Design a protein with these regions (language model features):
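Post-transcriptional modification and biogenesis factors for structured RNAs
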Residues: 1-164
Length: 164
């Protein structure tokens, strides 16, 4: 067996990506402080044909060299929009019948492995700040809370790992 070269991977170019049918998922970043994490989210969103990313609050926006370092050009392919207030984004998404899901540890959260998607339903996954998590007001406004099960000594995963 041999490793494939990049030229053999049959990937989409930026125009093909923009024109392609997307996965019915939107990512909402609620006050993410690390530019490297933001870039990693863009790269993951590109890999999974995610429809759009909302960058909210203090979350930095492209172009920025530290975002570009981990995004590797995905800021050109993945649609994104900045919004000052995450709650405003949630309200807009709900009006479009998109189910809002905060990824957080909270009362009555559903474990990720127990969550079942429904056909023809679109989802917005909300990821929070590296220290404080998803803000309480956003958790309260979300339709569902999903918790990623963890069994070690740490209380959380890095956001770029959680998004993946």
């Amino acid at each position: 067996m041999r490793k494939l070269k990049n030229s053999e991977l049959d990937r989409l170019d930026v125009k093909q990506f923009k024109d392609a049918d997307k996965t019915p998922v939107i990512i909402v970043l609620d006050n993410i402080r690390s530019l490297n994490n933001i870039g990693s989210v863009f790269r993951t969103a590109d890999a999974f044909l995610i429809e759009k990313i909302y960058l909210c609050g203090i979350t930095a926006q492209p172009p920025h060299k530290d975002i570009h370092k981990t995004a590797l050009g995905a800021t050109d392919s993945v649609a994104w929009e900045y919004a000052e207030n995450t709650l405003d984004v949630l309200q807009r998404l709900k009006k479009e019948n998109i189910k809002t899901i905060a990824i957080e540890q909270a009362e009555n959260a559903v474990f990720l492995n127990d969550f079942k998607t429904k056909p023809n339903e679109k989802y917005a996954l909300i990821f929070g700040n590296e220290v404080k998590g998803v803000s309480q007001e956003v958790v309260s406004a979300s339709d569902v809370i999903i918790e990623i099960p963890q069994y070690g000594t740490k209380h959380s995963l890095n956001i770029s790992v959680s998004v993946g």
